[in-house]
Amino acid sequence: MKIRHIITLLTVLGCLVCKAQTPAFPGAEGFGMYTTGGRGGQVYHVTTLEDGTQEGTFRWACNKSGTRTMVFDVSGTIVLQSELKIKNGNVTIAGQSAPGDGICIANYPFVIACKNIIIRYMRFRLGNQALKVNPSAHEGDGLGGMDSENIIIDHCSVSWSIDECLSVYGSKNITVQWCIASQSLNNAGHSKGAHGYGGNWGGSGATYHHNLIAHHISRTPRLGPRPGTQTDERMDMRNNVIYNWIDNGVYGGEGMNVNIVNNYYKPGPDTKTGAKGMRIASPGIRTTDYTKHDSSSPNQWDKMWHVWGKYYVDGNVNTKYPQVTEDNWTYGIYNQIENSKVDNTFTQETKDTMRISLPISFEAVTTHTAEEAFERVLDYAGASLYRDALDEVIVNDTRNGETTYTGSGCKRGIINSQDDLKPEGAGDDWSAWPELKSKAAPSDTDGDGMPDDWELQHGLDPNHPEDGKAADSQYTNLEIYLNELVEKITTDQMAGGVVLSGQQTTGIIVPFRSRIFPTSNRVYTLNGSQVGANYKGVVIVNGQKKIQK
């Protein structure tokens, strides 16, 4: 399949907007790619798995203020005793620094309530254990955050939510990339009853790419505007893998501007047949009833009353229904809309205006075909520096079209509690949370986050804590160390892709030169379609226009 995108007029090297900015880390892409997080700030070491406010806990580090980076001197599961809301921004949470199998946050929600945050290689596996003790304990997301700005979530694994698994949305300049959102809990104790939802996605410049969304009843994702961003919702959703959605799948998008490009939809054993199994997305609107438009006091959503979104949809694959792959719009979009549910506003004019021929503006993302993305995501998504037992199950289920776990009264692949994973005959000490073994933390004499041995190898002084803040042309020494820990994953996951970005422009549309594979020699026509190497005519090769005869 060709990568069929209209892409930006400017090459990466010539981009006037971004040339002076440094990505959050190598491999950071999309609208949140220039988040700075804790760059150049203080370093806080998490030295214990206990939850509390004492020095060395994760909660203590989260509650600190000022520009900072959290590194881990231990691996394992941190069982929260109450919700943890991080309110002070300018922070990097470097899960890849944990010695051993990594970190998991459990039992209570972790909520992003700050600006300028980088989170990498973490697990958030909520569970309903706290609700069994106290039914009003929480109704949380696995990883949530909204009404903020400058956020990038990279290589995180999220599961067992009471509400949605992964709902980082309604903010400005955000990226969620290379994550796994799986096994939301169905009947886990939510006050509204059955849930089992993947997440709400959207924002004023929001990118979601190369994520795996598996084993959910609905919202895989919900395209969800927020009151503060509803008039400027711009979202790019590409190269995601969506498996075993049971009912609604992707829907919403009221008044949003959305690219849905090269995603891989794989219906599972109990995904509904017919239209919902064919679904790419079911766009909706804010109806009269929803907005109270005809009342004396319309609500906050009324400003988007009857406003249809605009969508660029191309290159998406459905493994069960080839007609959807061949014609994304007829079967995957138009046939999903029930006119009676949108105040009978779904007319031919609506069809014509909601479908756009150029993508909405989006920041650079290494883009694969949907089929390539399926393999890349299954190989590298989630907290994959060490992939734990649950992620292994989710990936294998997705690859093989299987459902390893099912809860009582649930559709195949859906669970009510993490305890539904308990094998027959397991003892009282069994835990659903995968064991994460720790190793001894490397010696870091000056506490700057970089091991002594690494500092010596790079000509630094292990007794000089300011070394970590020193910078080359782009990154601090601490960032260079943290980036090196996952360098191979970053390089391998992007192989075979082309770095694309897009603006709605006039004139010739020129593909980006790939920053990762600058000599890939892929050939494009002037409208952005990839063609064979022997194509004759005016083409673009590595960001340069040429004539092939």
Model-derived segments and their meaning:
Residues 1, 20, 506-511, 528, ...:
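Terminal processing/anchoring signals of secreted or surface-associated proteins
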Residues 23-70, 525-531:
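Acidic Gly/Asp/Thr-rich repetitive segments characteristic of extracellular carbohydrate-active
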Residues 58-66, 78-94, 103-120, 126-149, ...:
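Extracellular beta-strand-rich solenoid/capping regions of secreted or surface-exposed proteins
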Residues 90, 95, 115-126, 147-160, ...:
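Right-handed parallel beta-helix
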Residues 105-110, 132-144, 160-168, 189-203, ...:
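Extracellular beta-strand/beta-solenoid scaffold signature
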Residues 234, 238-426:
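Extracellular beta-rich repeat passengers
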Residues 498-525:
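Residue-level detector of functionally pivotal "anchor" positions at catalytic/ligand-binding pockets or at interdomain
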